[in-house]
Amino acid sequence: MKTKKLMMVALVSSTLALSGCGAMSTAIKKRNLEVKTQMSETIWLEPASERTVFLQIKNTSDKDMSGLQGKIADAVKAKGYQVVTSPDKAYYWIQANVLKADKMDLRESQGWLNRGYEGAAVGAALGAGITGYNSSSAGATLGVGLAAGLVGMAADAMVEDVNYTMITDVQIAERTKATVTTDNVAALRQGTSGAKIQTSTETGNQHKYQTRVVSNANKVNLKFEEAKPVLEDQLAKSIANIL
């Protein structure tokens, strides 16, 4: 009997350790805010002595980004450019739209987070499994085992690896001395089974380039209020560095 009790204590202790290790590992590895910004395509602008920029910053996400244009303007000015309010007087146009700024799942790219979640479930299963060994005190042992699993689940619930992602489409136009001809083609839906094709041709004096900027902020128990300023700063820096 004494041996069985000792084995039960050892198994429960192991269960608690296993169920809590995922949460502890997450808390340690993700205690500091990590920020990463990537651009889908490189934009090469021709060297020019003109240093005037017109900004048009939009936000179609559900988050407040009212200070974003100011940050981008400051970053552009820090590069030695003048921000103007008239597009006709600007050599460069920078147009950007924040498509989405929200919490996004990183489980597919971070397998260690999956293992952390599995820890609590394994704890509950191990606790219930003790019943098969110690049938003389099945009720008490099952209760202890499930309690151990619930402790692990509670620990995992308190420690969450959170990643916020901001996705921004960017278009930059630069003036050129040559005449630029642009052919536009648009397919407009007509009901559920048809489409209308629209084509147009225009001439101008601008070359236009498009890219997408993806910024990530990752930290344990991260709130958007903490992620927002660094995401905005990263986007502003990335856009300004194109110039």
UniProtKB/Swiss-Prot annotation:
Cellular compartments annotated: Cell outer membrane
Any one Gene Ontology cellular component term annotated for this protein: cell outer membrane
Lipid attachment site numbers (S-diacylglycerol cysteine): 21
Signal sequence residues: 1-20
Lipid-modified sites (N-palmitoyl cysteine): 21
InterPro entries xrefs: TraT_complement-R
Annotated keywords: Cell outer membrane, Conjugation, Lipoprotein, Membrane, Palmitate, Plasmid, Signal
Presence of keyword Signal: yes
Pfam families tied to this protein: TraT (PF05818)
PROSITE patterns with a match to the protein in the record: PROKAR_LIPOPROTEIN
Membrane topology classification: Lipid-anchor
Location (main, coarse): membrane
Functional summary from the UniProt entry: Responsible for preventing unproductive conjugation between bacteria carrying like plasmids.
Membership in a protein family: Belongs to the TraT lipoprotein family.
NCBIfam families linked to this entry: PRK13731.1 (NF010291)
Name of the protein this chain belongs to: TraT complement resistance protein
Organism from which the protein derives: Escherichia coli
